[in-house]
């Protein structure tokens, strides 16, 4: 959460970070428990609806710069843990700038049509033919990890090309988010241990250094359980 919800030089998770999109600049929200400017007045049900359906507490649609299309796959236990952690932070009174997109993207009710095209709310059922480890990995990659948000290309409406180019690579802030899996063009094949080392340390002798938008991802994964990263 910190990577997107912290402005340069700001308090962690107090929001206000500008995120450039093809449709305008979106400002991240205050995730601290301040009741006036943050989520201090949010019930778990409201938090869960935002994470799974992309709808704020007051009923307005959120923009998919907040990757609820991925977070919808998170399990109930993970969402409960996130909610508890966020509300245990120090409350910071910080009103963030209002997001103002150009017409027609500023008409939030149109997000209902976008969601009908690109959003399938709710957790995905485990694949019975796969192991528990594989299913946990799929939940993390496609859900809370939201790897597809950067590593899957998007169409002109900002929707992920998940069916035709899932994890097929994309450009993010001028950086290449390379294809993952079988489509990766690395001259040295990735091994499981190499991937774990890279994701937790940001470096591997055969695969270079994680820079650009990937750097804060590594900073977060360095604190994650190795079992989840693996």
What annotation goes with each model-predicted range?
Residues 94-112:
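Extended, well-folded interaction surfaces typified by the phenylalanyl-tRNA synthetase beta subunit core
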Residues 20-49, 69-79, 165-204, 216-229:
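Electron-transfer interface patches adjacent to heme c in soluble/periplasmic c-type cytochromes
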């Amino acid at each position: 959460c910190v990577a997107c919800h912290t402005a340069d030089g700001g308090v962690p998770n107090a929001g206000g970070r500008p995120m450039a999109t093809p449709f305008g600049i979106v400002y991240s929200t205050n995730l601290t428990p301040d009741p006036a400017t943050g989520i201090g007045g949010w019930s778990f049900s409201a938090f869960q609806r935002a994470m799974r359906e992309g709808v704020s507490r007051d009923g307005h649609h959120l923009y998919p710069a907040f990757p609820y299309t991925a977070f919808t796959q998170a399990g109930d236990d993970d969402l409960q843990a996130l909610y508890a952690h966020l509300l245990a932070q120090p409350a910071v009174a910080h009103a963030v700038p209002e997001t103002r997109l150009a017409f027609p993207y500023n008409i939030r009710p149109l997000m209902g049509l976008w969601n009908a095209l690109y959003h399938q709310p709710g957790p995905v059922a485990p694949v019975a033919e796969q192991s528990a480890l594989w299913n946990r990995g799929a939940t993390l990659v496609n859900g809370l990890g939201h790897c597809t948000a950067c590593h899957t290309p998007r169409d002109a409406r900002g929707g992920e090309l998940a069916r035709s180019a899932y994890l097929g690579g994309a450009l993010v802030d001028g950086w290449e988010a390379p294809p993952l899996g079988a489509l990766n063009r690395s001259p040295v094949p990735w091994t499981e241990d190499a991937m774990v080392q890279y994701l937790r340390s940001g470096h591997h002798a055969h695969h270079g250094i994680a820079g650009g938008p990937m750097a804060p991802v590594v900073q977060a994964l360095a604190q994650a359980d190795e079992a989840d990263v693996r």
